[in-house]
Amino acid sequence: MQLKRVVEAKLPTPWGDFLMVGFEELATGHDHVALVYGDISGHTPVLARVHSECLTGDALFSLRCDCGFQLEAALTQIAEEGRGILLYHRQEGRNIGLLNKIRAYALQDQGYDTVEANHQLGFAADERDFTLCADMFKLLGVNEVRLLTNNPKKVEILTEAGINIVERVPLIVGRNPNNEHYLDTKAEKMGHLLNK
């Protein structure tokens, strides 16, 4: 286990009341959060989203990505389902950090795509560690999920880490003229399953 469960509190939202559960990485002290809606106990697979932190999309309403749209759509679907989990995976910019993400944006403004920009900065296309998310699910007592994602690599890594993904639920929202090239690159170079 790479994490410990530290604290929880009620979080009222426009979609209803969630239980916010805080986790801390044992090696680094970095924190992550789960939003739990309804009763996730029992043997029925839970609708879940692993949402990687995106300050620009989630909080600043950026149209460069689909992250903020996905966050809102996931919370809506979880609330409509009556139960579910959103893991807020605190690895900003596919885990290159906020300042490097802004540097990558500057390179994209010069014509590089999102993958090329990461490579120019000395990073892999995706630096995230989804095994942390498997540990969060386990600490919540959940081993079977219906995963809201377009990323088959996320499904693969969580499965290898012991989470049974019984269904991949597409989450295709937020395409606009500002992020079309970004989304096309994620599909073509990173294998994301996106429809136009």
Swiss-Prot record:
InterPro entries reported in the protein's UniProt record: GTP_cyclohydro_II, RibA, RibA-like_sf
This entry carries the following GO cellular component terms, namely: cytosol
Q: In which pathway does it act?
A: Cofactor biosynthesis; riboflavin biosynthesis; 5-amino-6-(D-ribitylamino)uracil from GTP: step 1/4
Pfam families, per database record: GTP_cyclohydro2
* Record key words, sorted: GTP-binding, Hydrolase, Metal-binding, Nucleotide-binding, Riboflavin biosynthesis, Zinc
Q: What note does UniProt attach to the cofactor annotation?
A: Binds 1 zinc ion per subunit.
> Some GO term, biological process aspect, for this entry: which one?
riboflavin biosynthetic process
Q: Does the keyword Acetylation apply?
A: no
Disulphide bonds in the chain: none
Superkingdom field: Bacteria
Q: Where is the active site?
A: D126 (proton acceptor), R128 (nucleophile)
EC number(s) recorded for this UniProt protein: 3.5.4.25
Briefly, what is this protein's role? Catalyzes the conversion of GTP to 2,5-diamino-6-ribosylamino-4(3H)-pyrimidinone 5'-phosphate (DARP), formate and pyrophosphate.
HAMAP family named among the record's database cross-references: RibA
Q: How does it assemble?
A: Homodimer.
Protein name in the entry? GTP cyclohydrolase-2
Which gene codes for it?
ribA
